[in-house]
Amino acid sequence: MTTKRKPYVRPMTSTWWKKLPFYRFYMLREGTAVPTVWFSIELIFGLFALKHGAESWMGFVGFLQNPVVVILNLITLAAALLHTKTWFELAPKAANIIVKDEKMGPEPIIKGLWVVTAVVTVVILYVALFW
């Protein structure tokens, strides 16, 4: 059965998300995926360079020392930290932790996640630099 009624379609501009700060920040947070793709491609390129020997690896290291690549990697680091911060702030909302009949606030969970991140980072750096 078909109808001749034309449904109302609310007009929506392509810049609807720019009107509220919440949506602007949401788009920024979702945009952190783009630098992550860059870093993933860079890692794969590095793995292939490592596979093809010392000369290829030295070429990759030279590529990493390019100022443009350093800036892109710093942008990627900032995007990853922003994404991590927002993810850690979301985690307490998803977990309902009760201690002594009281719901735990978000601060200990967020701080705990940052501590775990710092410890894992230090361990990885230690293994990479001194092992």
From Swiss-Prot:
Recorded GO MF terms: succinate dehydrogenase activity
GO cellular component term, pick one: plasma membrane
Its membrane topology: Multi-pass membrane protein
InterPro entries: Fumarate_red_C (IPR003510), SQR/QFR_C/D (IPR034804)
Family: Belongs to the FrdC family.
Subunit structure: Part of an enzyme complex containing four subunits: a flavoprotein (FrdA), an iron-sulfur protein (FrdB), and two hydrophobic anchor proteins (FrdC and FrdD).
UniProt name for this protein: Fumarate reductase subunit C
Natural source organism: Salmonella dublin (strain CT_02021853)
Gene name of the encoded protein: frdC
